[in-house]
Amino acid sequence: MPEVLDTYDYLIVGAGPAGCLLANRLSADPANRVLLLEAGGPDNYPWIHIPVGYLYCIGNPRTDWCFDTDEVPGLKGRSLKYPRGKVLGGCSSINGMIYMRGQARDYDQWVAEGNPGWSWRELLPLFRRMEDHFAGTSEMHGAGGEWRVERQRLSWKLLDAFQQAAAQTGIASVEDFNGGDNEGCGYFQVNQRGGVRWNASKGFLRGIAQRANLTVLTHAEVQRVLLEDGRARALSVRWQGRERRFEARREIVLSAGAIGSPCLLQRSGIGPQDLLERLGAGVVHELPGVGGNLQDHLQLRMIYKVDGVPTLNQIAGSLWGKLGMGLRYLASRSGPLSMAPSQLGAFARSDPQQPSANLEYHVQPLSLDRFGEPLHTFPAFTASVCDLRPHSRGTVRIRSLDPGEAPSIQPNYLSDPRDLTVAADAIRLTRRIAAAPALAAFRPQEYKPGPEYRSEEDLQRAAAEIGTTIFHPAGTCRMGQGSQAVVDAQLRVHGIPGLRIADASIMPSLTSGNTCSPVLVIAEKAAQMILAERRREAAPQVLESAMAAGGKEAVEA
């Protein structure tokens, strides 16, 4: 039997963006004892905080789970590296730092699918509450919150020209992607403070380290959720080399992400019956949708060689260039070392019939064959484009009951023919932008996938050959009703009192953009609902105490 260490009001699994925010909000009431558990270590690795350091965090077991997908039929049988944050701050410690809420229609669609309370109008105040926006308070933005948003600290002549070329192609320039309709082209706003990464640990934990009612444990790997009489009561946790048990008086909240949360449920005997029986887990509670509905944004990284303009390829390729970058960052926290992985963004429609922008571009003044490999020696830029609303759906399944064994991750990219059509249209649109007059002075030449891909069939084949994840998995514990839903609109796991999920896994459908800030608003909403429920339950007790006190006074009088 695991050793029982302690009992808390709330147990939170995973100190990624959602877990950090939840720990902050739930522990704001001193009456709540809160335990936050993180499988990774503290966020004290220097490369986490230097923005360009994501290159040294992705694929590094110190900060990354280092997952791989199964072989994906739609990608010519390729398996992809599938990074997920394993460190305090989670993916906010290794991601691209892009601040992106998505589109209003994303959240309104969740409501239309039977999830009241999740509309854009209802979530906007929560986005604003957490924000510390460089522009200050406005109708759309907040100031003084924990989640710092800044302008980037450099621009590139080549990217300015791409923005002009996009305008010449019909994609208007915009200053802010976060007003509910992100269509247009402009520089991304980023989660940085003074040229340093601003992760969820800094934003939501460091300022409250003195709270006596909050405990944060790192290197604590949660093995299983333990039920008693059908209710989630405790967690079995591997910590300091031993299996321990932590108990919850009120609730357990899973914030382990779109991969971690369904795997934890499955190891706990909660999930599809056939999987649980095959692995000998025992069916504690059948929920067929656990681990299904996996969605992700597939990026097509198109590369163009250029002439007559500096790119990071040349700057980082010389000793003097590296020295200059380092000195500039030390002196002013600016220059290439302060760069988010992608600086310029664009949201566009793959065809005029789309109701809103369904493509996102991440444009970079650099190129490489794949993450972890050196930059090319020739000057080039990358125009990465992804389908924001993929129809393909995948799965996440544990391979065994051993928490140390990586799961089966099958994204099933491009398995739906509609996604192949959008991919081909996206390549054609990118070529039109590259051929616009604003870029002509730099003589862009398509290097990847290559001009030889021309027909519809060619372009779909190119997408299968160059497509890769842009690290936005979601949907594996979807919110809603019906047989495939895992949580209700209150984020309560169907059929299991005392257990909620608050992370990207609950999204019924992907948001139209980067997913970190949408995950934060999910956690903000979850905290609001949890605390409201606590107040409702406490109200009768307060009334009873008041009446008892009043009755005593009446007798004494």
Regions found by a protein language model. Name each.
Residues 20-54, 119-122, 260-286, 420-423, ...:
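Classical protein tyrosine phosphatase
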